[in-house]
Amino acid sequence: MNFIPDNKSKPFFSLYYEKDGYDIKGKRIMGRQAAGWSFLKSIVQSQKYSRLGFYLKGAEQQKLLKDDVLTLLNNNNKSIELEYLSHSNVDLIESYGGIMLPGPDLTEFANSRAFYGHNRYSLCGITHTTASHSVMSSISNLLTSPIMPWDALICTSNSVLQTVNRILEAQSHFLSYRYNKKLDFLPQLPIIPLGINIDEFHFDDEYKSNSRKELNIEEEDIVIVFVGRLSFHAKAHHVPMYTALEACAKELSGKRKI
């Protein structure tokens, strides 16, 4: 296992790496981190690329990145070269075409790019939670940041796109009223659902049976899985789920266990 490639193939973008966006070992693992790690894993393990560019903010992040890449290359017959980028290394970033960010906040990166030329490279962010104050602020700030039409904010569903558009429309109306000027520069908002590696979700009947036994779940019992955080202010409100479970429990009372 090493970092010396056989060729110089590389993707059409570099990745912004900060450990928090890809960390699945902490006590409070969030969906954005699981998605970030899965994306990093797919890029590193892909046989398509032997050279990857990473936009970093210091030596500490560089070490953490190298550790993560070594972990992902473990038992994987592949060599890869890591190219480290900084905000001032514009020519190198430009050679990749752009920077892929693990979150929706493009403002800081757009401000850094502005010193060297808006058209030097693209920025591409992605949404996860959209109902938190910080994320809504990041989205509304797109209207007053040096964002260009060749930038993008990936929306992971139709509902996310609707949310993003409502935030932008509300902020646009406010700014038009405040400054008597319509702001037209917005990023592209493509809908690209999060993907998964289906090969990681193959469980045989023995595994399923043992898992149910460990949780004391009988064969006829019904298992309800809520995928996500029970957070009323930043995720889906949990009351509708509780109401539905209550209705199911009453209907199946004495018949099957939920």
Residue ranges and their predicted role:
Residues 197-258:
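Conserved catalytic-core segment of nucleotide-activated headgroup transferases in glycan assembly
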